[in-house]
Amino acid sequence: MLAIGITGSYASGKTFMLDYLTEKGYKTFCADRCIKELYQDVVLQTQILKLLPELESFNIRKISNLIYNNDLAREKLQNFIYPLLIDKLILFKKENANSKFGFAEIPLLYEAKFEKYFDFVVTIYCSEAIRMQRAITRSSFDIEIYNKIKEIQLSQESKIAKADFAINSGVDMLDLEKQIAKLIKDLECRV
C-alpha cells in the first residue's frame, strides 16, 4: 500500500478531500477524528488532567484554549498524544496493507515530523480569504484560536514546497475533482 499523507492549513479543505476519497472507496484515516475517539477514553482523560493540572475538568474547548495559549502545555499534550496517534496510524496501515492506497489527513504532519510515515505527501491549499470564509462557518470558530493555529503551523507556502503534490481547493467543485483525479493517476504510476 502506498501511504499518502494529506496536510494543509486550517480550513484549507483537508477534510473535504478525505471525505471525497472515502466516498470513492479509498481507505482513509483522519487524525482529528482519531484523537476525538481517544479523548472518549475516561482513563486517558484522567491522564491528561494529571498532565495538565491547569484544567479543572476534561473539556475540549478548555484544552484548545490552553494549548494554543501555552507552548509548554501544547508540547506536553503533543508528547503524550502523538505516540498514541502513531500507533493508530500504524494499525491503519497494517489493516489496509493489501489496498493500493491509504490516505491519512494529518493537519500538523510536518510540524509533528510525521512525514516519515508516508510514501508521499499532498498539501491542500487555498487563499487566506477562502480559509477565513470557511472557518467562520464552523460552529467551533474562535478568531483567537484561528490566529494561534496560524502562528504555530508552518506557512501554507512552506507546506506546498515540502509536499510531493499540491492541490488548490480554492476552485469550483469540478476543478477540485479533476485535480484529485489527476493525483490518483499520478499515484497509480508509482505503485
Curated annotation (Swiss-Prot):
Catalyzes the phosphorylation of the 3'-hydroxyl group of dephosphocoenzyme A to form coenzyme A. Keywords: ATP-binding, Coenzyme A biosynthesis, Cytoplasm, Kinase, Nucleotide-binding, Transferase. Belongs to the CoaE family. Pathway: Cofactor biosynthesis; coenzyme A biosynthesis; CoA from (R)-pantothenate: step 5/5. The gene is coaE. It catalyses: 3'-dephospho-CoA + ATP = ADP + CoA + H(+). This is Dephospho-CoA kinase. The keyword Ligase does not apply.
